A protein has these predicted regions:
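Residues forming the flavin
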Residues: 1-235
């Protein structure tokens, strides 16, 4: 609408991806944020368990999802679709133990203190019905469903790291080395999700939209994330 009124788009447009958030457009609520705001299965990638790319290979130190979310988004954006893989033992723990038990970072522990995902298994079934989660008795079935051609080999290698207590690939903290060994096996498909777009309509210092000649468009003001000024110099 602003462009139709004669305003120009600034040159600092981008997407804010500096933190990770689970998301899938197939889900009835597409984005995971605060507790009780989405299907809890969407949170599976942020508990330090195994994450794989679209071919079934690891691509990140999964502990970053728990403790260093500012570092987690770039690999996720690069990979696109990614999958959290868990076994029955891990899922049962998530459904019965406080979420804070899965985090080593004190800030995260405080944020989720006392919260238990007691409806996780039922919500996972709902996610499977929507098409963004899948459960099977074997890893091979999970791999076939999502086309994760390297998943079985990846899990075999990963379980070796869990047994030894040393991640030789991404050097994840041993506290997050939970094996994927006991069926049934669970997979949750996620896609990148950003907070907002950065940049937009070019404005002057008074927030007035500018036209192609940098003259103010009468009566048109732009603020916040819709304005180019928000990105540069303030963001």
């Amino acid at each position: 609408l602003a462009q139709q009124a004669g305003a120009q788009i600034g040159k600092c447009f981008s997407i804010s991806m500096n933190e990770y958030g689970g998301a899938n457009t197939k889900a009835s609520i597409t984005y995971a944020f605060r507790p009780d705001t989405c299907n809890d299965a969407m949170r599976l990638p942020v508990f330090g368990g195994l994450l794989v790319d679209a071919e079934g290979g690891r691509f990140i130190n999964e502990g970053f999802m728990c403790e260093r979310c500012m570092f987690a988004a770039e690999p996720v954006v690069r990979e696109g679709y990614h999958y959290a893989i868990a076994d029955a033992a891990f899922m049962n723990r998530l459904a019965t133990e406080p979420v804070s038990d899965f985090y080593g970072d004190a800030r995260m522990k405080g944020m989720f203190d006392g919260i238990v995902l007691s409806d996780l298994l039922e919500q996972f079934d709902a996610a499977a019905e929507e098409g963004w989660a899948f459960k099977a008795d074997t890893l091979a079935e999970v791999a076939e469903h999502f086309g994760l051609v390297n998943l079985v080999a990846t899990v075999e290698e990963y379980n070796g790291y869990c047994e030894s207590g040393s991640d030789e690939q991404f050097f994840k903290d041993a506290a997050y080395l939970n094996p994927v060994a006991e069926g049934p096996f669970y997979a949750v498909q996620s896609m990148p999700a950003g907070w907002l777009s950065l940049g937009g309509i070019k404005t002057n210092a008074a927030g007035q939209a500018l036209d192609a000649h940098n003259h103010a468009v009468a009566g048109l003001y732009v603020a916040g994330a819709d304005a180019d000024l928000f990105t540069s110099p303030y963001y």
